């Protein structure tokens, strides 16, 4: 009961903050959105954003929203997504069930996998070029993005999570202030919250032992990763540790870190929450350049 109360409070507090923030923002003009596309397997929906002026099939970014696994929906990152779309990408924004509503990690992976497969099936209708496909995720969405990559490259994990590998290859992943390993040690309120969530990710101990890309360095090929973080973010130690892990395991990556002294206004997922910031535009540009070279 206490856990559900905490998740409910988190959802209300973050939701209130996001509503206040989004009242001061608006999506960029010139972007068309195909909304509420429903997958065949479950009543799971996704949206697709495209620059109105561009014709034909466009490279695809699957953007997985954050929200601590307990909050958010496919419209949460809509302003940020329009900044990606205006730069020539078709952006798929999937919905997934939340821990606060009684779902578990396996259900979240299933929803996201279904959205990816359905978008591929409709690629001609939606104008999606899957020869240039990328994943992006912020905060908890970063965890889900890297876990999806891991599952796609492991038959063992596909069996464990009850999903199939996507029918296309992902060329690179963009991560904003991610939680690559939800079981990582972290102090303070954020660390306490991660520890509380452990029992809600799954009741299956095998899932709990296999829910982070950091466990699979010898089992899967590692993705090319563009990693963004900042010193004011309480979760930044996780990004720093992840960058070290990528380095130790020979992954191709870029770590874009904005220190607190020179960038005092930047906080958790600033590039997604405030894409109009100069630093956000810089980070977005460099991430997309990284994608194009992947």
Each language-model region and where it sits:
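Alpha/beta-hydrolase superfamily serine-hydrolase fold, recognizing
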Residues: 1-294
